[in-house]
């Protein structure tokens, strides 16, 4: 039991490090970007990122949980794991086509996106590259250190380059380009780790891909209800109000999201162990251990 708690606690701690970094890194660049860009341009960045929350939700489609579950249930069978990753990758590629079509319609109909169409499409490329990061795989095999280090290194480089490259209001287009660069670094990092673990991706039949989408749909609905609310507010604000108004709204929502993010690492960290052991006692002990941290947050 002690070993199980230690493993789950380690997973949670690593995910907390990543969650804290997800909050801190944008705040590190916030004063600089607010000084470099006009309020309207900062509003454009915030608005497009809110739209990308939905694009990401569509392409993830709950696979962070359903994929993690399948990887855990594969019980270390490398061949089976490779097939699961291939099947989910196919599903996400199919979903990316749907997400891109929806995005093109939004660009056509929403003025703030239409005016910054190239910026929006480049930002979508960064979300698209997440398909090849396979976070559910490393959560399933409980290699949370890979997930966390991948994020810290790729985003850390992007933040450093932000200070080095972004110099004036005309550099707006460089923001998504730096995000794409960070994602490419993450993709190369992850594929190196997969080779080291001897995991080879093999693709599955179309019927099995559709079946995977069907099984993951319940997780997708859960993610939509839990994640999309804040982004929906910002999207609606951008439809009816100016980019300047979006900037002030997004800043408020960013701090709210920072507090809410403290809860996610607990459920994500114990999920692989719960799937493997189905141990409710472990769940209760972990919750009791980390509750003071969450309450203080």
Model-derived regions: residue spans:
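Alpha-helical transmembrane segments of multi-pass membrane transport and lipid-handling proteins
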Residues: 20, 27, 59-60, 65, ...
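Helix-loop junctions and terminal segments of transmembrane helices
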Residues: 60-76, 256-279
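Helix-loop interface residues and adjacent transmembrane-helix termini in multi-pass membrane transporters
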Residues: 36-39, 113, 140-141, 168-169, ...
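Membrane-water interface at loop-to-transmembrane-helix junctions
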Residues: 211-223, 277-295
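Alpha-helical transmembrane segments and their helix-entry boundary regions
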Residues: 15, 42, 84, 88, ...
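Short, Lys/Arg-rich, polar N-terminal cytosolic tail immediately upstream
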Residues: 1-8
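Hydrophobic transmembrane helix module of multi-pass membrane transport proteins
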Residues: 91-221
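Transmembrane helical elements of multi-pass membrane transporters/channels
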Residues: 11-26, 147, 153-158, 175-194, ...
């Amino acid at each position: 039991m002690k070993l199980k708690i230690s493993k789950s606690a380690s997973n949670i701690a690593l995910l907390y490090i990543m969650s804290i970094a997800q909050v801190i890194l944008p705040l590190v660049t916030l004063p600089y970007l607010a000084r470099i860009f006009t309020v309207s341009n900062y509003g454009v960045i915030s608005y497009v990122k809110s739209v990308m929350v939905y694009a990401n939700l569509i392409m993830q489609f709950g696979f962070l949980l359903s994929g993690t579950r399948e990887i855990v249930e594969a019980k270390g069978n490398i061949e089976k794991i490779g097939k699961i990753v291939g099947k989910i990758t196919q599903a996400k590629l199919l979903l990316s086509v749907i997400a891109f079509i929806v995005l093109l319609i939004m660009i056509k109909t929403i003025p703030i996106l239409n005016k910054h169409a190239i910026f929006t499409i480049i930002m979508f490329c960064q979300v698209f590259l997440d398909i090849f990061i396979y976070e559910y795989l490393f959560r399933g095999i409980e290699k949370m250190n890979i997930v966390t280090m991948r994020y810290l290194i790729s985003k850390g480089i992007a933040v450093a380059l932000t200070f080095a490259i972004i110099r004036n209001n005309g550099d707006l287009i460089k923001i998504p380009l730096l995000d794409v660069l960070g994602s490419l670094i993450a993709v190369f990092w992850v594929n190196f780790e997969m080779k080291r673990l001897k995991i080879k991706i093999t693709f599955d039949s179309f019927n099995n891909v559709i079946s995977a989408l069907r099984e993951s749909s319940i997780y997708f609905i859960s993610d939509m209800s839990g994640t999309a609310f804040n982004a929906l507010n910002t999207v609606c604000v951008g439809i009816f109000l100016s980019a300047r108004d979006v900037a002030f709204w997004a800043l408020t929502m960013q701090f709210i999201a920072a507090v809410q993010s403290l809860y996610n690492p607990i459920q994500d960290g114990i999920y692989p162990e719960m799937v493997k052991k189905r141990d409710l006692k472990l769940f209760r002990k972990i919750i009791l251990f980390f509750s003071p941290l969450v309450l203080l947050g």
